[in-house]
Design a protein with these regions (language model features):
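N-terminal metal-binding scaffold of metallo-dependent hydrolase/deaminase domains
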Residues: 1-38, 48, 397
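Active-site core of metal-dependent hydrolases
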Residues: 166, 176-300
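Active-site gating loops and adjacent loop-to-helix segments of metal-dependent hydrolytic enzymes
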Residues: 64-99, 138, 152-160, 207, ...
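Mid-domain alpha/beta scaffold segments of enzyme catalytic cores
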Residues: 107, 115-179, 184-185, 192-197, ...
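C-terminal cap of metal-dependent C-N hydrolases
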Residues: 357-410
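Alpha-helical scaffold segments that flank or form the walls of functional sites
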Residues: 48-49, 66-138, 167-177
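Divalent metal-coordination and catalytic microenvironments
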Residues: 7, 23, 28, 46, ...
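His/Asp/Glu-enriched, well-ordered alpha-helical/loop segment
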Residues: 230-240, 283-367
Length: 410
């Protein structure tokens, strides 16, 4: 059993801050939350408990190459088969690679992240590597495996008729034996028939499907030129993904299509900006009613710090709204917490209440820049740093605890 006394807890899917006399858990469940009063501002510090954060789009395989693509375009740095990251990853042994991934998952826990959805390159080997790192650290890695190579040459892609070659089909089955689902870089990497095969196999096995869409205009333009349909349209029609990533250049019609589909989108504004791309239309996506998540994208581009991602997203959204009032900072915090249910289902509520998973983060609002906050949610989104994280728990077990932190009952 664990317990905290006299803490502020963001409760329920509304993430409403309450001063609580007791916050207790036993095993993997929250067992007692004794509320006192709702609270928005504090004058003399507190410990603040929030749901564990979910990083909904990562590539932790390339976390061993921080800032290695500086000065390179998206295509030069990240596209198969000759992009920088693929050339560098191919040179690493397992013994060289695994410690980097483990260290970055530990950094996630240090910064309040309990789980992530990872586009894992390098075929079955890549998925196995990340699975091992997750077991070592306790961070939940939802692994979305990718082919190790490019199954089709340019002529086959232009013809857009071929099914998966037998070797690619066998690799797909091997990936799904390890991973939680499948992902690809773009809809333009495979033929329509291949996407149909992947959808059929993943549906039969109950696996997740994810895809990058509209990261730049080229994604749409290549798809239109080859098939007469944009990449988002093809993704929804052929692949039926659970998660669509980026939407950086989505136009009003594409945003409406996403919202009508009921699909979840993961935004990655820091990565988009770092690549010199447009930032996503956050305001329009929020106003559409689509379920939105946040991710930090490639470890090569960004440290996987969700507090930094929330801060940047919130301020971009305010700029796009054009006033100092919108959006509510809680809407941004939900993108890193309870909105995860839209992809992972009711086993991952992303919020705190009695009977729900004991998956939470304890923040030190005794620190000088936090102790007299006038708006607790806004300060969580814009002011919390990794040094302010006292503890990160997943399913009742600590992933990280700062020196001197104690959660023993008293």
């Amino acid at each position: 059993m664990g317990a905290l006394s006299d803490v502020i807890v963001l409760l329920g899917p509304e993430l409403e801050p309450w001063r609580c006399a007791r916050f207790e858990w036993e095993g993997d469940r929250l067992t007692r939350i004794e509320r006192r009063e709702p609270v928005l501002a504090i004058a003399a510090g507190a410990r603040v408990v929030i749901p564990g954060l979910y990083n909904s789009h990562t590539h932790m395989g390339d976390s061993c190459l921080p800032d290695g693509a500086t000065g390179l375009t998206l295509e030069e740095g990240f596209f198969r088969p000759h992009g920088f990251k693929y050339r560098m990853l191919a040179q690493l042994t397992r013994e060289q690679h695994l410690p980097h991934v483990i260290n970055h998952l530990r950094y996630m826990a240090r910064t309040g992240t309990v789980g992530h959805l990872d586009f894992r390159e390098q075929g079955p080997y890549g998925s196995e590597l990340l699975r091992e790192a997750a077991l070592v650290t306790g961070v939940e890695s939802v692994i979305l495996g990718q082919f190790s190579g490019v199954p089709f040459d340019a002529s086959a892609l232009a013809a857009n008729a071929s099914r998966l070659p037998p070797a690619a089909r066998a690799e797909l089955e091997a990936i799904l034996a390890v991973a939680d689902g499948f992902s690809e870089s773009t809809m333009n990497d495979l033929t329509d028939a291949a996407w149909g095969e992947i959808r059929e196999l993943t549906e039969r096995q109950g696996k997740l499907r994810a895809i990058h869409c509209l990261e730049n205009a080229g994604y749409r333009d290549v798809s239109l030129g080859r098939t007469g349909r944009g990449d988002l349209v093809r993704a929804l029609e052929l692949y039926d993904p659970h998660l669509i990533v980026h939407l950086t250049v989505a136009d009003p019609a594409e945003i409406a299509l996403l919202a009508a589909s009921g699909k979840t989108a993961a935004l990655n504004p820091r990565a988009n900006a770092n690549l010199g791309l447009p930032v996503p239309p956050i305001r329009a996506l929020m106003e559409s009613g689509a379920n939105l998540l946040l991710g930090t994208d490639n470890g090569l581009l960004n440290s996987p710090n969700m507090f930094a991602e929330m801060d940047y997203t919130y301020k971009l959204a305010k700029s796009q709204y054009g006033d100092a009032v919108r959006p509510d900072p809680l809407a941004i915090l939900r993108m890193a917490t309870c909105n995860i249910r839209g992809v992972l289902g009711p086993s991952h509520p992303g919020c705190l209440a009695e009977g729900l998973p004991a998956t939470f983060v304890v923040l030190d609002f005794e620190r000088p820049h936090l102790r007299s906050t006038r708006h607790i949610p806004a300060s969580i989104v814009t002011r919390v740093t990794p040094e302010d994280v006292l503890a990160t728990y997943r399913l009742g077990s600590p992933l990280y605890e700062s020196e001197g932190f104690s959660a023993r009952p008293s």
